[in-house]
Structures are given as structure tokens and as C-alpha cells.
Amino acid sequence: MKAGTYKVKAKGHGSSFMPMEVTLSDDAIQRIQVDASGETSGIADEVFKRLPAKIVKGQTLNVDTVAGATISSRGVVGGVAEAITLAGGDADEWKQRAKPEIATQAAQVEEYQTDVVVVGAGGAGLAAATRSLQHDKQVVILEKFPQLGGNTTRAGGPMNAADPDWQRDFAALTGEKETLKRLANTPLEQIDPEYRADFERLREQIKEYIASGAQYLFDSNLLHEIQTYLGGKREDLAGHEIHGRYQLVKTLVDNALDSVKWLADLGVKFDQTDVTMPVGALWRRGHKPVEPMGYAFIHVLGDWVTEHGATILTETRAEHLLMENGRVVGVVAHKTDGTKVTVRAKSTFLTAGGFGANTPMVQKYNTYWEHIDDDIATTNSPAITGDGISLGQEAGAELTGMGFIQLMPVSDPVTGELFTGLQTPPGNFIMVNQEGKRFVNEFAERDTLAAAAIAQGGLFYLIADDKIKETAYNTTQESIDAQVEAGTLFKADTLAELAGKVGMDPATLEDTINKYNSYVDAGHDPEFGKSASHLKCEVAPFYATPRKPAIHHTMGGLAIDKHGHVLDKAERVIAGLYSAGENAGGLHAGNRLGGNSLADIFTFGRLAADTAAQENG
């Protein structure tokens, strides 16, 4: 190889491309420097700590990826391989070299006695741990991956909570009042009995708001409740109906704003200048952190539990619950080095997420989709494999809603990631099929969007112009340009040219966009009923982002009550056992609204910790 320092770019997580500098001698890799400033914070931190050193020490590219950060790990290896090729070396030979030797040690045993043990260090687990520490409890956290965060790190960021005093500062958008009118006109007999009184109260709120002529953004806990309930009310393939348990939905919407305030008190900074709406949220009530994505929550909570004395054991997989006389009294786990860990605790929290990264398990339980492909992509962390659900079953926990799987309609068609391309608020979505035609109300629920996309063959495109581009989440112009250069995002000066690049008929795409623009002007979409379109698509350059549904959220899980107790098959509390977040079921029922997951994990994680502290001293 020709000695020198080579500058390359490697694919990171999401839309980022990581600049790298690789210094080579004529026969060795001497140094690897990665500029990860554009990488998704919290997902691949351990990659940049471990992998370059492992490659340099072992003088091989045959290295294992870092658990939970496969894409970034492959990106680092690929970047070094590119540098070797540029230097005239044989990258394939480096990839075929022996793996670095792993030091072995005799099996160890660790034992802990504590007040609280938390299994899974995503948002729900860290919320439970933080709140337990606020109650002066001793806390042990078990996380099977090298770093904290779980799926929460990958979340888009907006957290649903009705906050009418704040929302009054924002103007109502064209069509939002029509959405409220349609909701209020829902026949009462279509509302399940336990929700009817609240629905009638909501009707009166909407009637009063419309009659007042107010032009501000309306919201209330009741609107959030009824949208969550109706948004999750579904039938499976056999015609069995499911909807969210009233007490769980009520607890969520009545406590979500307190969760936002609690997080703010801990140090999470929210952008008060913008009320946002993730895809499939149905309403603008999202509290968006200033920092990008879910890392805004994870680093604050992670730092807080560390600073306040939690014992954090990463790369430690919980394998069994300890049971005594029908009560859960702790966990048995193993570290990746073989060390056996036994934690005895007064309170055990299962917060290990759902099973969206376990395709065979998804296929086993699915009763909602006609077919789940073996090679379907997922938006999930590889950690999300159903571990906490299996642990709960050991204690006799009831499962609920397991057949309902949410597909994220606007995922990367190759990786399943959320934030490649131009991912905007759904008010700015223009979804077109491979013929260049719109095919759905872009404001609809996620399962509706995913089903419509599947009916079109799966692959579709989000069309944007320069103004819509400015509303995209979690990206930069540098990243956009890099994706255009890589051929994963398409850009053109005219719609006709853009159509040619993605294989559409130019006249069809132009006609579609012209009609869409006219609907924005009119405030009414006669084709698909999209009620709130923010921007027209008319300012060059134009973009097409390829999208395809991927597994996103598993609504089912352990049955819980409103206090976070795990319930058995007779709906009795399992003493000492609590759950929250995607590990639990019963809240979202058949479909989860965008932005409700963050409200869920922080609300039920926090409240379950309050319950445990009160019950277990």
C-alpha cells in the first residue's frame, strides 16, 4: 500500500455520512479518525470508542459489529476498506484475516441486593429508574446492549401531550376545523360504552370552539383521549375487534403533560416555538426537544441516573425472573463475558421494549396483516426482540393485543431507517406511487398509510420542493447532497426531470402536483380528503424520497393496569412486577398514534415507579 492519510466518507445511521481519516503505512493501519458529528447521537457512540482501536490492534477488518449499531459499524469498516483500496491495497484480504483474539477469563458471579431492578434501559426503563431514585431507592439497571437508549434513541422526538394554554399561541391550519367537525359527527353508537360520556363532553368542547369563531389551535385531554381510542380501534383478519383499555388511555392523556414538565425539570429542553405532528399522529400536539431525535431524552435521563447513584450494567442480558411464593423478587442475568449476575429486588421493572426486531416472533403472533415477509425491514434497534415479554410470561403474565403489528409507512426501503431522505411533518407529505399518482390521505393513521402503500406494491415516493425540504426533520443540506450523490435521494430542477429519474411519466407527476397545489389553495382535497395541507409543491429544486413500510411498533405485550402492575391471566396483580412502554400492551390496541409512544414510556415508567415506591417501602 502507498503510505499516507486517506479521507473517505462512510455511511452512518439515518441520513448521515461520516467523514473519516485513515492513516496507513505500507503494510499496516496506523490510525482511524471518525468525525461522527453528523451521526445519530446515542446510537453508535460505542462504535467510535471500540471499533477503530480493535481494527488497529488486530490489523484486520474481520471484526464483529457493535451490538445495536450494525449500520455504523459496517460504515467504519467500509470506510477503512475504501482507504485501503485507494492506497492500492487489497481490502478483501484484510476482511478475510483472522478476527482479533478475545481474552478469556474464568466464569465470575456477581450478586446485588437492591430496592429496584430495571430490565431494559430505553426511555421507559430510564424513566422508572429516575423516578425511583427520586424516591430515594437503590436502583440496578440491566441493559443487554453496550449503551443506554434502546428504541427511544431512534425516536423522531415529538412527544404528544395536550397543552391548550401553549397551543392557543398557534394558528389553526386550513382544514383542522373540518377534522373536528367530522369527529364530532361520529354516531354515538360507534363509540364504545366506556368512552361515550367523554365523547359527548368532547362534542360540547368542539361545538363551543367552532361557535366562538376562534382561529387558534384547539386541543384538550378529551380530544387526545378520543383520537387515541379511535386511532387504535381495529379488527384483526378474523374480525375480532380491539380498542384501548379506557383506564390506560385516560391515564396517558391526563398525565402526559406532567411527564413533559417532569422531563423539562430534569433538563430536557423543548422547542416552545413549534407545535409539531409526527406521521400518523392525527393532531398537532407534539412537544419537540431542541436536540435531535430521542437522544434528547436519553442523554438527560442517562446522565441523571448515573449522577444519582444507579448501578448500570450494560452488555448484561436478563434471562430469568426470581420467584418466591408467587412474588417476583429479582432477576438472573448474564454478561457477554459469561459472568452470572443475580439481582434480588423489592420491585422488578420489565421495560425491554416490544419485539419489532424479531421477525419470526412478529410472524408468529401477527393477526392483522395478510403477510409479513421474511426479509421485511424494521425501524427498531436490534435489541427489541421480545425479551421482556418472555420474562413476564415466566411469572404467569397475561398477554394482550399481540397480533397487532404497526408498520411505519415512510421507512427507508433498504434499511428500514426513519430519517433518510426528506422526512417532513405529514401535512407536507405528498405520497405518490410508482406511476406518479397520489393514492391515500397523507394525514391518515400509520396502518392506513402502510396498507395503501402495500396495495401499490410497497415502494412509493415522497415528493417535496425546496420549501417543503426546509421542514424536514433531523437532516442537513450536506446530508441531503450526499444522498443525492449516492443515488438514494433524487433531485431535479423540474418535476418532469424528477419523474424521469424515478421512472414515472412526467405528465402524470406534473398533473398530480398541480392538482395537489390547487387543493392546498382551496383548503379542500376532493380526492382523498386530506384536511390540513401546509405547503404547495412549486419551488425548485424538487426531490423524491423512496419509501416502503417496515416493522415499527408491536402494540401487544404484558397486560398492565393503570398503576403499572403486571397482571396475570385472571387480571390479578403479580406482586413485585411492573411494566411500561412497548413491553406492555393494552393502551394502543390495534394502532398507535405517532407521538404517543414517548408519552407512553415516560408517563407509565414514571407512574409505575411511584406505585412501586408506595407499595414496597
Swiss-Prot record:
One Pfam family cited in the UniProt record for this chain: FAD_binding_2
Gene3D superfamilies in alphabetical order: 3.90.1010.20, FAD/NAD(P)-binding domain, Succinate dehydrogenase/fumarate reductase flavoprotein, catalytic domain
Residues at the active site: R446
Enzyme class, first EC level, given as a word: oxidoreductase
GO CC annotations, alphabetized: membrane
tRNA-binding listed as a keyword: no
Domain of life according to the entry: Bacteria
EC number: 1.3.99.33
Catalytic activity: dihydrourocanate + A = urocanate + AH2
This protein's record includes keyword Transferase: no
Record's keyword terms, sorted: FAD, Flavoprotein, FMN, Oxidoreductase, Phosphoprotein
Binding site for FAD: A124, E143, N151, T152, G156, G157, D387, H553, E582, L598
Names of the cofactor(s): FAD; FMN
Cofactor remark: Binds 1 FAD per subunit. Binds 1 FMN covalently per subunit.
GO molecular function terms attached to this record: FMN binding; steroid dehydrogenase activity, acting on the CH-CH group of donors
Modification FMN phosphoryl threonine, positions: T70
Miscellaneous remark of the record: L.fermentum strain NBRC 3956 is significantly more abundant in subjects with type 2 diabetes (T2D) compared with subjects with normal glucose tolerance (NGT).
Known role: Catalyzes the two-electron reduction of urocanate to dihydrourocanate (also named imidazole propionate or deamino-histidine). Dihydrourocanate is present at higher concentrations in subjects with type 2 diabetes, and directly impairs glucose tolerance and insulin signaling at the level of insulin receptor substrate (IRS) through activation of p38 gamma (MAPK12)-p62-mTORC1. Therefore, the UrdA enzyme from the gut bacteria L.fermentum strain NBRC 3956 may contribute to the pathogenesis of type 2 diabetes by producing the microbial metabolite dihydrourocanate.
Protein family (similarity comment): Belongs to the FAD-dependent oxidoreductase 2 family. FRD/SDH subfamily.
Protein's name in the database: Urocanate reductase
